[in-house]
Regions:
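Short "domain-exit" segments at the C-terminal end of structured domains
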Residues: 135-139
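Rossmann-like NAD(P)(H) cofactor-binding subdomain of soluble oxidoreductases
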Residues: 54-134
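NAD(P)+-binding Rossmann beta1-loop-alpha1 motif at the extreme N-terminus of oxidoreductases
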Residues: 1-51
Length: 139
């Protein structure tokens, strides 16, 4: 399954890590700037405090989502305040299914802005207890 995780914050990084556990998934992350460089150079590094381990995943990144790019599913993990900026980009993209994770306060406006059938858009929540995503400046 071709999967895009749109956003490389704490939720996006943890979600990408979990999705990569299934080797059938082909996961790509949309990240920008210094954080994209960090993931490209050193991998996606997560310190799992409860399990007392650190994982490093190699995951391809993109900086922008082109309208013609197609994924089986796109997980949108940006903060709710960032949605107005990215909804036009998502609306133009030809991927069929979108899951908005952790930014549900604007669900109705997201559905209206995306102009897609309601069964092609979902809203979810992710439990992120006891993990730490290593920031670029700390490693």
């Amino acid at each position: 399954m071709r999967i895009l995780v749109y956003g490389a914050g704490v939720q996006g990084c943890e979600l990408a890590h979990r999705l990569l556990q299934n080797k059938k998934n082909v996961v790509t992350m949309l990240a920008r700037g210094e954080w994209k460089e960090r993931i490209d150079q050193k991998g996606l590094t997560i310190r799992h405090w409860a399990q007392l381990k650190t994982t490093v995943d190699r995951v391809p990144t993109i900086e922008t989502l082109a309208p013609e790019e197609s994924y089986d599913i796109v997980f949108v993990t940006v903060q709710a305040g960032q949605l107005p900026e990215i909804l036009p980009v998502l609306k133009q993209n030809k991927s069929e299914f979108f899951v908005f994770v952790g930014n549900q306060p604007h669900a109705r406006s997201v559905l209206q802005a995306m102009q897609r059938p309601a069964d092609k858009i979902a809203f979810g929540f992710q439990n992120l207890s006891l993990i730490h995503i290593s920031e670029p400046t700390r490693l």
